[in-house]
């Protein structure tokens, strides 16, 4: 439901594939409304085979006396149903679309065709993945920090935050205003080019 545009691509139901190939016990699905309503206060969901669900039921039964039922009711009253969730997420998209467009504008206008990096152009979600030349992610983030732009730490998308090639930077454009993003992206693309030139010298 975290789509930026109307008529999003429909994702395959991974559980259907697990049923087809007899691997349902290998899959545990998790989700929450945390980025739909408010961070840390959403309702979480768990999907799995009956065997795995029973495993979770046993453990959850002794971990907590029960979920926050008042918060669950607030979520239900606010969102109501799938149509309510989708309507609410369209409002999210209206806020986020210009921010993602600003990121793409700077990446395309300043870095395209220069051989200094590649990047995603997501149709949903909350991040743009930027791959610099190998060995430069930490340096680009350091340079940006010195110029006053705080970026997600290098390796954030990897297990234990260890990017073996030190190249992936996760750009998170959802929080800043479009105006602040404009300034931050001007600095970011300069840092990418500066680090790339220094590496080649």
Regions found by a protein language model. Give the residues of each.
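Short beta-strand segments
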Residues: 31, 45-47, 120-121, 127-131, ...
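Conserved glycine-rich beta-strand-loop-beta hairpin in the small C-terminal domain of fold type I
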Residues: 90-104, 116-131
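PLP-dependent enzyme catalytic core of the Aspartate aminotransferase-like
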Residues: 23, 146, 161-201
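Short, conserved catalytic or adaptor-binding loops enriched in Gly and charged residues
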Residues: 16-23, 109-111
């Amino acid at each position: 439901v975290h789509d930026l545009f109307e008529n999003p691509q429909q994702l395959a139901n991974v559980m259907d594939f697990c049923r087809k190939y007899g691997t349902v016990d290998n899959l545990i699905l998790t989700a929450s409304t945390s980025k739909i309503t408010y961070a840390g206060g959403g309702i979480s969901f768990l999907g799995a085979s009956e065997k795995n669900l029973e495993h979770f039921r046993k453990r959850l039964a002794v971990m907590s006396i029960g979920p926050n039922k008042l918060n669950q009711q607030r979520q239900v009253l606010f969102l109501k149903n799938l149509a309510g969730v989708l309507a609410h997420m369209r409002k999210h998209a209206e806020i986020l679309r210009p921010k993602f467009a600003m990121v793409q504008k700077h990446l395309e206008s300043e870095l395209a065709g220069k051989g200094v990096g590649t990047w995603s152009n997501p149709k949903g979600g909350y991040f743009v993945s930027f791959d610099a030349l190998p060995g430069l992610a930490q340096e680009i983030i350091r340079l940006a920090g010195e110029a006053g732009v705080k970026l997600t730490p290098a390796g954030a998308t990897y297990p234990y935050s260890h990017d073996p090639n030190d190249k992936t930077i996760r750009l998170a454009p959802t929080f800043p205003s479009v105006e602040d993003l404009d300034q931050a992206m001007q600095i970011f693309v300069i840092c990418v080019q500066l680090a790339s030139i220094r590496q080649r010298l």
